[in-house]
């Protein structure tokens, strides 16, 4: 050791006190300084040591050898201890120490010697380091002898090897503890997380001890080693090595050299500091720690942290139990433990690195603190918007951080290891705090403290807005009092009104009382709730600043009178409604929170009240009697007492704007009646204001609202209003109104806005589409909706939405874009563009038989919507409900109607309920119960390749666009590393379909973690907040079963009432029928004479004969069924006699011709039927009636679901054309499509949407048709049976063999027939294969079908079903069709066109000279093939009127004859072929009778009357060449007879029609020249009558 340079510290210069670089990087030693606390590095020139030894007498003549000295390492440590162990001088500072008295931590002033503390710490850290070397170590024992000053530290685990060092030739324990610069931590290539680094450690303790003993046992060598050093390690005793059995352990016992630290022994402060360090070990080393033989109760880091928070509470005087979130812990990595607590306004930290107590923090503390402060800064910015920006250091002052970390090869500022300098990148691990950790932090008081600090910081800003006693204010909205701001200002009154409209009333009153003492200022909406607002928010609130300026208020000033203010009184003038009460409350809240002393000044705050109802007699301008009411309960009580009096008129004053200027002047002339002073605020009333407006009092508000009882109102007859009465009797009405608007009823599951919409729709019987914006206007006018129509439009849209996650049963039918699951309804179109109507299903839910039993609300004396509906099933469970009110919120998921109906039936049968789980229509994912009242909704994800996954369902109410945004964020990798490469979007408005590509590495990780978890494809929904209004008050239900039981009880009562009501009504009808029968019979028998008598006499006679009077005149109409009943006009002077006479109008109003014996017989039959009906109802129980309604409901539910599924299948099976412009290909014609269709189980009747079948099969199908002549053939479908009435009219195949008629094109550019409404030239329609079959109208139909299929009820064109037809009527004499007539053929028209086509001249343009027709997909028609496949009928019916078989039609060619992309083969001509025999040739029917007279017909030349575009009138149509009119008689002169022509027609159409056509491609495009307009809403056409 003597050969070593005492200043050579090259082995440890990476971690020297001058080293600020990571390990293994060398740095030149800087120039040393006198008394420096930093160790020295390599020194080449000893001249650098100048100044090491101080000279007190520099004038002495000393030689150079004495001046320059070289010390040994040991001598240098003793000479300059501050370089190694810190200062040896006593230091006083505030530190955390252990208090034996309070048995906890204590933050106090401590006087200690840092060097002494450090040598003890080195031994403790060595013991803790052994835990990293041997994981089996589990105990540390520390013994402190206060009397002798001796300290010992014992630990088990692997001991020090008792072996001879091969190089140093000494035992290893002696080498480690008795020789400097020895360590096992010099290999920086090893990633060690121990505290030892420099090779000093325990040797420093030995050096500064008078006695130092090491004792260790090696179980492998079975030896025990003990050795003692004395006199500052200068004397070493002989090692004692003995044989021993037992476990390994190491024990260090030392007695510090207190003299070198200026101490005589251990004092109280040092003992407290040593004990705190022992407790540090217990909390951080993860081993059992004993102090003086007793086990320390601290088991983990969290318990250790709680010692500090208890001390903080104790210092505050809070001796209560710790809060739930007082200490928040997080351990995102095995090497990190992080704790958070709220500080008292200064940043505090307690941290450990490898069990070393880091008193000055360092990079590890900054690493954690920066993350927390960054998250807190985000929240501060959100909650303190537009306020003063806080710096991170200001936020840091409010947090207390605990860190226990294991850092690889840590570097410190000095050997004292008070501050870590290792860079974050070299920690060897990461500690990214979890999101849940942040959420828990935000729930503590830290945010409140930070915001409070921000508010204090903003005080200066608020003082800038303080008002002063100025005589003039610059604000155009303010009408200032003339004396405001003067010495008489305290007599002035500032009137605050609710909006500009109310300002007019105040201004009119101001004119009465004079402008000198009254000022007026209108408020804009509701005042800010300053109870939980920041100062920045208040400072930016213009209304509050205006009030401060106008009154002259100064921030935080205490007022005892108003003499220093511009206004001495503040008058609130608002509407007498709930919102007006809320505005008053907000103003009171502002004054109490900001200027509480003002509310203790008498007469400062007053309110101006106006009547809410006025009643009078006589002329409203000059009434004989008049009375005003200031509350509705007060008016209702008066009405109950005086309702029988006649002549009273009433008027509701819903707002201050209802009052006229004359009314205002009357009010202000009687100020004593209309002014109500608020009583001075009492101390206990402050809590009431906080209860009403503080967010922290939400739970207390729930109880307050539940205690509300209907009929509560504030009595305005008192002179002064207390704040207690205002809160409990007036403001609570606003809270209740808010809850009623937001929380649904348990009976019908509706909120008032939804109820108003349904009431309006039921009242209007809204069966036709109406714009949403228009319906909102009707609802607002019908039901007195008092809020904006925008929210009402959203309510209507919500009732009609059907996408996954919305309604299970929608009451309104959507017609237009009402939103989808892409954005959760946010993608809904504007209310101006969408339509809705009542869904027919709605009356299955809200039965009309219940309407007379319901209680209706009233507004302004008029009946409006019901208080509550009583649906057949609990809609609150079927459609769910969500809402947030005052103090209450509600969240009820959707349930399956099938399950609900089954359980209702089980309740009727007395059986237990089956458990139900949430269910959403259309959701294909999995729903599982994950605990009591908790359900997990999982999406669907599956692995489709080595690097690919497919997502086909998302958790409920996770919208497609939101999930797509998340995928984009993952790809951007701004927050977290990306684990996906790309994705493909195949989503539709109803289906979810993502295909995601991943790297192989990430794919394996995702599979190991779970694909569902990796992509967050699950969401939990709870049923713990089932809040709803029961029939009496707001209630929180414990379970869904409780809601079912509550609904069951209410609904069953209504079924009993419904039965009684129906029996009562039936009995009335029976009595009327009986009286009518007896009345008519008596007249017939001559027992009653009604002629030549006065009405009064006749009424008296009827009463004498016991005819029952029915006073309702409306019932007289029912008495005569559909016959009109004569009602005599009322005479206001006739009085009770007239009322009595009207009661017999059901008899006297019967028509004279009904006074017959036949009528008597009919009435008797009706009486029998009615009696039978009554008996049937009597036998039914209320449960039976309910079960019948439930069956109707569930059958309709299933039918609607089946219909919706069928419509979706048909739309999905519709083909897609090839588009040369958009580069899309056709779909649906291949084997794969047929296979897919078969797999879906599609109805084979959906043929009109499928690709055409082969010609062979088509021909075979047609040959099965039965004979019977042309007319019999025309009356039936060729291959389908006649649909039954149960099918709802025509079947899908009713469209077979029908086409649009086409007129001759004799004249250039002539229109065959104009459509009933203009067509858009930009719209094309592709005629489908079903249209090919629509050639001949069906005989069975009473009227022909329109050219465009009518719309279904949901606004979409019907695809498969034709509208029901009425009975055929006689057809008048044919006349030329007008443009407004339908475009279809009946039997006679068909023959007329046949004859016209036969009369056309032959036109055979060269096919080679034709231009190639372009095709594009521009169709949205209902079927796949257009009528362009057929061309004119005469094109297929060759030979009619022609002897040579050539074509005689100049109509456009068959679509199949045109050249098509990818096919140059046209339709083979059949003109020269002879007619084949047909089974219809033997028919003897004379079809010539069907042909009109032989008057020659020329080609029609129709001049266009407007811009309507027809099928054949396009400028690009090169086939439509002008043709001269045919010569007269040409059709008759040509070869065949009319009958033969008809037979030829039949042959072509029935037997050989499909043979004539080549097999068309799966999807035929529409030729651009032949453009047709698709009318989505065709105008109804007049049906043509058949003769």
Swiss-Prot record:
<feature type="binding site">
    <location>
        <begin position="196"/>
        <end position="203"/>
    </location>
    <ligand>
        <name>ATP</name>
    </ligand>
</feature>
<dbReference type="InterPro" id="IPR018522">
    <property type="entry name" value="TopoIIA_CS"/>
</dbReference>
<keyword id="KW-0547">Nucleotide-binding</keyword>
<feature type="compositionally biased region" description="Acidic residues">
    <location>
        <begin position="1419"/>
        <end position="1430"/>
    </location>
</feature>
<feature type="compositionally biased region" description="Low complexity">
    <location>
        <begin position="1524"/>
        <end position="1542"/>
    </location>
</feature>
<dbReference type="Pfam" id="PF01751">
    <property type="entry name" value="Toprim"/>
</dbReference>
<feature type="compositionally biased region" description="Acidic residues">
    <location>
        <begin position="1"/>
        <end position="15"/>
    </location>
</feature>
<dbReference type="GO" id="GO:0046872">
    <property type="term" value="F:metal ion binding"/>
</dbReference>
<dbReference type="GO" id="GO:0006265">
    <property type="term" value="P:DNA topological change"/>
</dbReference>
<dbReference type="InterPro" id="IPR013760">
    <property type="entry name" value="Topo_IIA-like_dom_sf"/>
</dbReference>
<feature type="region of interest" description="Disordered">
    <location>
        <begin position="1"/>
        <end position="47"/>
    </location>
</feature>
<dbReference type="InterPro" id="IPR050634">
    <property type="entry name" value="DNA_Topoisomerase_II"/>
</dbReference>
<dbReference type="Pfam" id="PF02518">
    <property type="entry name" value="HATPase_c"/>
</dbReference>
<keyword id="KW-0460">Magnesium</keyword>
<feature type="region of interest" description="Disordered">
    <location>
        <begin position="461"/>
        <end position="485"/>
    </location>
</feature>
<feature type="domain" description="Topo IIA-type catalytic">
    <location>
        <begin position="743"/>
        <end position="1190"/>
    </location>
</feature>
<dbReference type="InterPro" id="IPR013758">
    <property type="entry name" value="Topo_IIA_A/C_ab"/>
</dbReference>
<feature type="site" description="Interaction with DNA">
    <location>
        <position position="791"/>
    </location>
</feature>
<dbReference type="GO" id="GO:0003918">
    <property type="term" value="F:DNA topoisomerase type II (double strand cut, ATP-hydrolyzing) activity"/>
</dbReference>
<feature type="site" description="Transition state stabilizer">
    <location>
        <position position="832"/>
    </location>
</feature>
<dbReference type="Pfam" id="PF00204">
    <property type="entry name" value="DNA_gyraseB"/>
</dbReference>
<feature type="binding site">
    <location>
        <begin position="415"/>
        <end position="417"/>
    </location>
    <ligand>
        <name>ATP</name>
    </ligand>
</feature>
<dbReference type="Pfam" id="PF00521">
    <property type="entry name" value="DNA_topoisoIV"/>
</dbReference>
<dbReference type="InterPro" id="IPR014721">
    <property type="entry name" value="Ribsml_uS5_D2-typ_fold_subgr"/>
</dbReference>
<dbReference type="InterPro" id="IPR002205">
    <property type="entry name" value="Topo_IIA_dom_A"/>
</dbReference>
<feature type="compositionally biased region" description="Acidic residues">
    <location>
        <begin position="1379"/>
        <end position="1391"/>
    </location>
</feature>
<feature type="binding site">
    <location>
        <position position="126"/>
    </location>
    <ligand>
        <name>ATP</name>
    </ligand>
</feature>
<keyword id="KW-0799">Topoisomerase</keyword>
<dbReference type="InterPro" id="IPR020568">
    <property type="entry name" value="Ribosomal_Su5_D2-typ_SF"/>
</dbReference>
<feature type="region of interest" description="Interaction with DNA">
    <location>
        <begin position="381"/>
        <end position="386"/>
    </location>
</feature>
<dbReference type="InterPro" id="IPR001154">
    <property type="entry name" value="TopoII_euk"/>
</dbReference>
<dbReference type="GO" id="GO:0005634">
    <property type="term" value="C:nucleus"/>
</dbReference>
<feature type="compositionally biased region" description="Basic residues">
    <location>
        <begin position="1571"/>
        <end position="1587"/>
    </location>
</feature>
<comment type="function">
    <text>Control of topological states of DNA by transient breakage and subsequent rejoining of DNA strands. Topoisomerase II makes double-strand breaks.</text>
</comment>
<feature type="site" description="Interaction with DNA">
    <location>
        <position position="529"/>
    </location>
</feature>
<protein>
    <recommendedName>
        <fullName>DNA topoisomerase 2</fullName>
        <ecNumber>5.6.2.2</ecNumber>
    </recommendedName>
</protein>
<feature type="active site" description="O-(5'-phospho-DNA)-tyrosine intermediate">
    <location>
        <position position="833"/>
    </location>
</feature>
<dbReference type="InterPro" id="IPR031660">
    <property type="entry name" value="TOPRIM_C"/>
</dbReference>
<keyword id="KW-0539">Nucleus</keyword>
<feature type="site" description="Interaction with DNA">
    <location>
        <position position="959"/>
    </location>
</feature>
<dbReference type="InterPro" id="IPR013759">
    <property type="entry name" value="Topo_IIA_B_C"/>
</dbReference>
<feature type="site" description="Interaction with DNA">
    <location>
        <position position="526"/>
    </location>
</feature>
């Amino acid at each position: 050791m003597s050969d070593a340079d005492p200043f050579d510290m090259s082995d440890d210069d990476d971690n020297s006190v001058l080293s600020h670089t990571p390990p293994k990087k060398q740095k030149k030693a800087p120039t040393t300084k006198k008394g420096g606390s930093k160790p020295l590095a390599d020194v080449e020139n000893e001249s650098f040591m100048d100044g090491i030894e101080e000279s007190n007498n520099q004038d002495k003549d000393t030689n150079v050898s004495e001046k320059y000295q070289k010390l040994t390492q040991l001598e240098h440590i003793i000479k300059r201890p501050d370089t190694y162990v810190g200062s040896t001088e006593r230091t006083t500072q505030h530190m955390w120490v252990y208090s034996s008295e309070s048995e906890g931590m204590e933050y106090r002033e401590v006087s200690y010697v840092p060097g002494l503390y450090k040598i003890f710490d080195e031994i403790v850290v060595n013991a803790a380091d052994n835990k990293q070397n041997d994981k089996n170590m589990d105990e540390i024992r520390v013994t402190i002898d206060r009397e002798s000053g001796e300290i010992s530290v014992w630990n088990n685990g692997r001991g020090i090897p008792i072996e001879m060092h091969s190089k140093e030739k000494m035992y290893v324990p002696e080498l480690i503890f008795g020789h400097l610069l020895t360590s096992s931590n010099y290999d920086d290539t090893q990633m060690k997380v121990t505290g030892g680094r420099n090779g000093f450690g325990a040797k420093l303790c030995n050096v500064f001890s008078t006695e130092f003993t090491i004792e260790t046992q090696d179980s492998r060598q079975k030896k025990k080693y003990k050795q003692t050093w004395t006199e500052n390690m200068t004397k070493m005793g002989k090692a004692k090595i003995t044989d021993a059995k037992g476990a390994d352990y190491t024990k260090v016992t030392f007695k510090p050299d207190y003299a070198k630290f200026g101490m005589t022994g251990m004092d109280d402060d040092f003992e407290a500091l040593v004990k705190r360090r022992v407790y540090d070990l217990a909390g951080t080393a993860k081993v059992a720690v004993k102090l003086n033989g007793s086990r320390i109760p601290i088991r983990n880091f969290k318990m250790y942290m709680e010692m500090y928070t208890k001390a903080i509470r104790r210092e505050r005087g809070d001796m209560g139990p710790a809060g739930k979130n007082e200490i928040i812990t997080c351990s995102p990595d095995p090497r990190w433990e992080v704790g958070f607590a709220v500080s008292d306004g200064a940043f505090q930290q307690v941290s450990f690195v490898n069990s070393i107590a880091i008193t000055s923090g360092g990079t590890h503390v900054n690493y954690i603190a920066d993350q927390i402060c960054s998250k807190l800064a985000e929240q501060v910015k959100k909650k303190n918007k537009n306020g003063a920006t806080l710096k991170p250091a200001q936020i840091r002052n409010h947090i207390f951080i605990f860190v226990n970390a294991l850092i690889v090869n840590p570097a410190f500022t000095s050997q004292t290891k008070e501050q870590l300098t290792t860079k974050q990148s070299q920690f060897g691990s990461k500690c990214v705090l979890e999101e849940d950790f942040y959420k828990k932090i935000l729930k503590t008081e830290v945010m409140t403290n930070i915001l409070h600090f921000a508010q204090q910081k903003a005080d200066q800003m608020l003082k800038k807005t303080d008002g002063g006693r100025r005589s003039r204010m610059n604000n155009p909205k303010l009408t200032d009092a003339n004396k405001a701001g003067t010495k008489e200002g305290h007599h002035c009154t500032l009137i605050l009104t609710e909006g500009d409209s109310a300002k007019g009333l105040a201004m009119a009153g101001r004119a009465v009382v004079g402008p000198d003492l009254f000022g007026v200022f209108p408020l804009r909406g509701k005042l800010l709730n300053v109870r939980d607002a920041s100062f920045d928010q208040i400072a930016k609130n213009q209304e509050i600043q205006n009030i401060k300026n106008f009154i002259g208020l100064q921030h935080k000033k205490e007022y005892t009178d108003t003499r220093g203010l511009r206004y001495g009184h503040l008058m609130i003038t608002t509407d007498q409604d709930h919102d007006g009460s809320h505005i008053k409350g907000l103003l009171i809240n502002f004054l109490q929170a900001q200027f509480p002393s003002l509310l203790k000044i008498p007469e400062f705050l007053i309110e101006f009240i106006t009547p809410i109802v006025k009643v009078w007699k006589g002329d409203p301008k000059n009434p004989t009697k008049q009375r005003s009411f200031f509350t509705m309960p007060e008016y209702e009580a008066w009405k109950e007492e005086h309702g029988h009096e006649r002549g009273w008129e009433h008027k509701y004053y819903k707002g201050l704007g209802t009052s006229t200027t004359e009314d205002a002047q009357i009010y202000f002339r009687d100020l004593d009646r209309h002014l109500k002073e608020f009583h001075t605020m009492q101390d206990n009333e402050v809590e009431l204001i906080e209860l009403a407006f503080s967010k922290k009092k939400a739970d207390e508000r729930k109880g307050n609202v539940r205690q509300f009882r209907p009929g509560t109102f504030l009595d305005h007859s008192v002179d002064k209003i207390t704040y207690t009465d205002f809160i409990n009797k007036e403001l609570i009405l606003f809270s209740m109104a808010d809850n009623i608007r937001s929380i649904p009823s348990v009976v019908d599951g509706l909120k008032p806005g939804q109820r108003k919409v349904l009431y309006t729709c039921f009242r209007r019987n809204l069966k036709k589409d109406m714009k949403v914006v228009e319906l909102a206007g009707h609802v607002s006018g019908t039901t007195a909706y008092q809020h904006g129509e925008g929210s009402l439009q959203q309510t209507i849209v919500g009732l009609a939405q059907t996408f996954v996650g919305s309604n299970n049963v929608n009451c309104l039918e959507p017609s237009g874009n009402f939103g989808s699951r892409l954005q959760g309804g946010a993608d809904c179109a504007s209310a101006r563009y969408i339509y809705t109507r009542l869904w027919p299903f709605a009356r299955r839910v809200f039965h009309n038989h219940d309407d007379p039993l319901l209680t209706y609300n009233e507004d302004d004396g008029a009946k409006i919507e019901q208080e509550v509906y009583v649906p057949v099933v609990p809609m609150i469970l079927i459609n769910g409900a969500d809402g947030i009110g005052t103090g209450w919120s509600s969240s009820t998921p959707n349930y399956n109607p099938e399950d609900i109906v089954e359980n209702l039936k089980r309740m009727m049968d007395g059986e237990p309920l089956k458990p139900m789980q949430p269910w959403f229509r259309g959701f294909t994912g999995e729903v599982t119960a994950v605990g009591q009242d908790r359900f997990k909704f999982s999406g669907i994800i599956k692995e489709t390749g080595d690097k690919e996954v497919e997502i086909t369902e998302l958790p409920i109410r996770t919208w497609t666009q939101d999930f797509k945004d998340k995928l984009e964020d993952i790809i951007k990798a701004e927050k977290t590393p990306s684990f996906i490469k790309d994705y493909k979007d195949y989503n539709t408005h109803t289906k979810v379909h993502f295909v995601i590509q991943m790297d192989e590495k990430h794919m394996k990780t995702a599979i190991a973690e779970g694909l569902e978890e990796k992509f967050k494809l699950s969401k939990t929904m709870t049923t713990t907040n089932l809040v709803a209004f029961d029939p009496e008050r707001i209630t929180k239900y414990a379970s869904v079963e409780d809601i079912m039981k509550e609904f069951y009880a209410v609904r069953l009562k209504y079924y009993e009432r419904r039965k009684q009501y129906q029996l009562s009504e039936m009995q009335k009808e029976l009595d009327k029928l009986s009286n009518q029968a007896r009345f008519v019979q008596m007249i017939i028998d001559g027992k009653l004479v009604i002629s030549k008598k006065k009405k009064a006499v006749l009424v008296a006679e009827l009463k004498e004969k016991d005819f029952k009077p029915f006073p309702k005149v409306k019932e007289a109409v029912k008495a005569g069924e559909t016959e009109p009943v004569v009602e005599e006009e009322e005479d206001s002077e006739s009085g009770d006699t007239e009322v009595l006479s009207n009661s017999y109008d059901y008899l006297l109003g019967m028509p004279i011709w009904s006074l017959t014996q036949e009528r008597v017989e009919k009435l008797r039959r009706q009486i029998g039927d009615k009696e039978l009906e009554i008996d049937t109802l009597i036998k039914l129980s209320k449960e039976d009636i309910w079960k019948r309604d439930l069956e109707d409901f569930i059958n309709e539910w299933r039918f609607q679901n089946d219909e919706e599924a069928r419509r979706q299948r048909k739309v999905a099976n519709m083909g897609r054309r090839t588009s040369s412009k958009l580069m899309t290909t056709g779909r649906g014609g291949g084997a794969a499509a047929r296979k897919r269709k078969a797999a879906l189980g599609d109805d084979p009747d959906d043929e009109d949407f499928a690709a055409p079948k082969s010609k062979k099969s088509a021909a075979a199908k047609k040959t099965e048709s039965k004979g019977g002549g042309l007319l019999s053939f025309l009356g039936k479908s060729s291959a389908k049976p006649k649909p039954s009435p149960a099918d709802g009219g025509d079947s899908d195949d009713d469209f077979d063999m029908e086409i649009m008629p086409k007129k001759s094109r004799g004249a250039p550019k002539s229109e065959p027939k104009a459509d009933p409404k203009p067509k858009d030239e930009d719209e094309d329609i592709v005629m489908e294969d079903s249209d090919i079959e629509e050639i001949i109208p069906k005989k069975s139909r009473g009227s022909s079908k329109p050219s465009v299929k009518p719309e279904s009820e949901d606004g979409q064109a019907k695809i498969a079903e034709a509208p029901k037809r009425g009975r055929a009527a006689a057809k008048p004499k044919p006349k030329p069709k007008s443009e407004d007539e339908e475009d279809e053929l009946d039997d006679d028209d068909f023959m007329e066109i046949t004859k016209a086509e036969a009369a056309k001249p032959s036109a055979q343009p060269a096919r080679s000279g034709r231009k190639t027709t372009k095709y594009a997909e521009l169709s949205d028609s209902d079927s796949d093939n257009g009528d362009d496949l057929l061309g004119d009928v005469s094109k297929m019916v060759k030979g009619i009127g022609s002897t040579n078989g050539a074509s005689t039609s100049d109509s456009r060619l068959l679509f199949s004859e045109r050249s098509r992309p990818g096919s140059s083969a046209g339709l083979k001509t059949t003109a020269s072929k002879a007619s084949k025999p047909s089974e219809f040739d033997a028919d003897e029917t004379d079809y010539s009778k069907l042909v009109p007279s032989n008057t020659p017909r020329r080609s029609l030349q129709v001049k266009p009357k407007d811009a309507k575009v027809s099928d054949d009138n396009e400028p690009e149509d090169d086939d439509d060449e002008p043709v001269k009119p045919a010569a007269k008689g040409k059709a008759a002169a040509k070869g065949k007879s009319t009958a033969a022509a008809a037979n030829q027609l039949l042959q072509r159409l029935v037997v050989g029609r499909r043979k004539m056509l080549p097999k068309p491609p799966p999807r035929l495009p529409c030729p651009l020249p032949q453009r047709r307009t698709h009318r989505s809403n065709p105008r109804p056409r007049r049906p043509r009558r058949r003769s």
